[in-house]
Amino acid sequence: MKVKGTYFQNSKEKPLVYGDVEIINPKRRRLRGEDEKEGILAESVIVGFCGTDKELMHMGEGGRLSEKFPEGTKRLINGHEGIVWVPEQERFAIVLIRGGDSYDPTRYTEDETYFEYGCDKADGLFSDCNYYNPDMLLPLPDGCVKNGKLSLSFAKKLLFADPYGCMVFQLERMEDIGSAHNFRVEMAKHKCGEEEGRRLAKKHIFDRTVIFGMGTTGMFIGDLIRQNYPEAEIVFVARSEEDKPKVQFVLNHVKAKYVQSCFDSNEKLADAIKEKLGGTATTFLGVSGSNIEHEIAFRYGVLGNNGLYNSFSLGPQVKFDTMPFGFKNQIILSSINFRQEHMEKAIQILAKSSYDEIVELIDKEEFTSDPIDAYCNKIYSAGAPLKTAVIWNEKYINEEE
C-alpha cells in the first residue's frame, strides 16, 4: 500500500524525502513472551519533531542508516511523537514507540531484540497512515475528544508522551541508583536502619541538581524532580539570555535558578554554577549535546563526592581521570528509554499540564514542499521554539476551542 510520507535514506544530497512510500505490515510483538501480531492501520493526526529526527537525517547524509531500516527496505519513515486515529476501533491513540523480543525494554540484553517506531527497524508517524501493533496503541485521557474531534491544546500536550515517559524512567532510575549508592552514609549519619537510610538517600541525591542544557528533556526532568522533591535546589545552565521567553517559561515552571553560559573560561562557568547552587552538585544532568558537560562536571569539580552524572545527550564522549573519580565515589549512568507504565504515567501528567504553550505549528504544505529546508531553517534553527509540530490530518482536530 502506497501513501504519502517523509522518509530517511542513505543519500548525501537527499537524506530526507517527501513522496510516495510503500508501507509494510510485518508481525511484531510488544514484549518477550507475547504473541507476534500483525499491525492495524492508523491515520496520523498530529506529529511532533524531535532532535532524534535531525540526528537520523545526518546519519542518512553520511550513509550510516542501513541498520535502522525496516527489514527488506532501504528507507525509514520517521516520526515517533504524535497521535493517530484508529478507524477499526474508532478512537484516537498514542503509539507506544518501543517494543520487541525483550522482557523489559529499559534493560534489554544482548540476546534480545527491539524496535522503535520511526527510529529503528520500524516505520513511524510521518505518513498518511501506517500499521501498528494493536497492543501498542495507548488510550487518551478522558476529556480530550469532543464530537469526534481531538482538542488541539490536548494534542499539543500529548505530543510529549515519548520524551516525558523517558524522563519518568530517568527519575525512577536515579532514585534507585541514588538510594543504593548512598544509603549506608545516611544510616551512619542518622543512626537509622536500612529502610530509612534508603529513603533518605533517594531524597538527598537531588538536593543540589544541575541541568546542563535547556531543551524539553531537561525541562521535563526538572519538572519531575520539582514535583517529587520540592526542597531540591535546581540550576539550569544554557547559552540563551535569561530574559528569553523559553528560558523564562522553564524557570517559572520548574521554579529553578539559572546560569548563562557566557564566560570566557570553563573554570569561571563552573565557579558560577557552584555559587548559584550553594555548593557542589549531588546530581549533574547533561542534556545539551556538548562535550563541555563532562568537563564542567569532572575536570572543574561541579559534581561533588558521592554524586550522580546522568547523560541524556546524543554525541558527547565522557572523559574523566580514574583516580580522582574513584576517590570521589561518583557514578556515571546513561539511558534513553522507558516502559509502557512510564508512558502511561506521562500521559496523565501531561494532560493536566500547560506544555501546549511551548508548541508551535508548521504548515503541512510548507514542511512537505521542502522538508530538508524546513528542518535546517525553521524546525531546528537557532531561533526555533522548544517544540514544533505539524497537523497531518486536520479533519480530526478541533482548532476552535
What is each PLM-predicted segment?
Residues 180-209, 226-229, 244-331, 397-399:
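Glycine-rich cofactor phosphate-binding loops and adjacent beta1-alpha1 units
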Residues 163, 213-216:
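Glycine-rich Rossmann-fold phosphate-binding loop(s) that bind the pyrophosphate
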Residues 216-217, 242:
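Hydrophobic/small residue at the entry helix of a nucleotide-binding pocket
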